Structure formats: structure tokens, C-alpha cells
């Protein structure tokens, strides 16, 4: 847990240990407390990624509908195996054809050889010798074009555009893969997220002792900055920081309706095996 807190905050081991003790082992509370006290460097937004596998995308011929599926394996070696990759492509194609994103229902879909997705998964498990799981799927439909991008088989993004074309969509999807915005525009940030950010800002050291009107002015400025940082349209475009994503899309006569971003293993905590301890325990009988 100390290691994870260090990775997410960039702080030293002793500082992280102390923060975890004070937060009774609650890592999210520890990060909030460290930010409030002004200790923490910018906390990394991405959750810890532990599980292996791949993200695969399938798009219809008109490029107006796309499905993205995350399928997990136990090791990165298997995630690069041709049998695994072939299975991923078949699952995505079947999900697209049926317009399905429910994992249980995807398992019931028929493949071209007549077997179900679940039967094919079980056969793959027997052949490869690892646990293979279809974890989640996302689907987008666009009035204009769908933008799709998969980075290294591990990060997948779908963009639904109103107007525009696939090339613009791919550019925006690459940006989302790299920068990981929270929402399309600032007005979509959930109220609870906004309130939590306000609470953290109010508790920061430079707010202490200032008149209420000054605090509110500073709060407003910092909240506006936060909203721009997490909103896709307000972010500097990753391929040309001199323009924003919003300006890029507007210049093309398009709008971003929505996006989906999947990262392999996101939110799954992988068990860390201490092989030295295992050997020692085995030696002791």
C-alpha cells in the first residue's frame, strides 16, 4: 500500500507511511489529506493497472458504430499470443454485430464456427493454460464519425463525433488516450467531484486566515483551472499545444458528443507474489 501511495503522489516512503497511519490505512483519504496540507505533488489520476490482457475495437463499415472490449489474461506473454489476439478480434466482431456490451450476454453470442463466445473462451483457457476473462465492453454510436484508437493493445478510446471524419476522430482519440480527460466539457463534471475539489482547495495552507471574499475569489479561480484541466475540449491538443481540442474540432465544423476510454487492468489489484517467502516456507515444511 505504501508503494502504491508513493507511485500515485511522488512522495517519499516515510511521508507515505505517516499519511497512511493517520488515515487508518485508507489510501484515498491519505491522498486527500496530503493534498489539503500542501504536501502532495499532483496525484496521478490513473488508477493502478495490474492485470494483463488487451483492448480491441470493432467498427461498422459506415464508421458510425463501434464496440470496444477489454479481455484479461494472467500474463503479458499470453496477451501477445496469436490465439489470444484472434479470440479478442472474434469477440469484438460478435459484440459489434449484436450491438451488445453486457459481458454475460456477449458470452452467449455465436461465432462463425457455431460455437458460443463462452465455449471459445473455455477452449482457449484449456489450450493456453491461463485464466481468460472478458471483463467489460463499451459501445458508441455517432451522428457523424466514430474515432477509434488503441495504443499498444492496452489503452483503447472511442470518440463519437457530430460532423467531422474518421481522421479527426482518431486525432481526438489519440489525445484522450494520452491525456485522459474526465469529461467532454466542464459542465459534465459530477457535483460530488466538484464539491470534493472545493473542500480540498479550501483546506490548503494559503487559504488560512484570508477574508471570506478573497477565499471565494481564489476558490473560483482554482476551480476554473481544475475544470479546464479535466475537460477534453479545454485541454491543449497533444499534437499541437498551441490550440485546444475544442478549437480543433470547431475548426473542422464538428462537435464531440461523447467518448469512452478503457485501460487494461484498470482498477484491478494484482496479487503480488513473494517467491522468496514461498521458497522459505516450503523449505520449513
From Swiss-Prot:
Record-linked Gene3D superfamilies? 1.10.286.20, DNA helicase RuvA subunit, C-terminal domain, Elongation factor Ts, dimerisation domain
Where is it localised?
Answer: Cytoplasm
Entry keyword annotation includes Plastid: no
The answer to whether UniProt assigns keyword Chloroplast to this entry is: no
Give a GO cellular-component term: cytoplasm
Where does the protein principally reside? Answer: cytoplasm
SUPFAM superfamilies from the UniProt entry? Elongation factor Ts (EF-Ts), dimerisation domain, UBA-like
Region (Involved in Mg(2+) ion dislocation from EF-Tu) location: 75-78
Keywords tagged on the record = Cytoplasm, Elongation factor, Protein biosynthesis
Xref: InterPro entries:
EF-Ts_dimer_sf, Transl_elong_EFTs/EF1B, Transl_elong_EFTs/EF1B_dimer, Transl_elong_Ts_CS, UBA-like_sf
What molecular functions are annotated in GO for this chain? translation elongation factor activity
Report the protein's function.
Associates with the EF-Tu.GDP complex and induces the exchange of GDP to GTP. It remains bound to the aminoacyl-tRNA.EF-Tu.GTP complex up to the GTP hydrolysis stage on the ribosome.
Q: Which family does it belong to?
A: Belongs to the EF-Ts family.
Q: What is this protein called?
A: Elongation factor Ts
Q: Kindly list the organism's lineage.
A: Bacteria, Pseudomonadati, Pseudomonadota, Gammaproteobacteria, Oceanospirillales
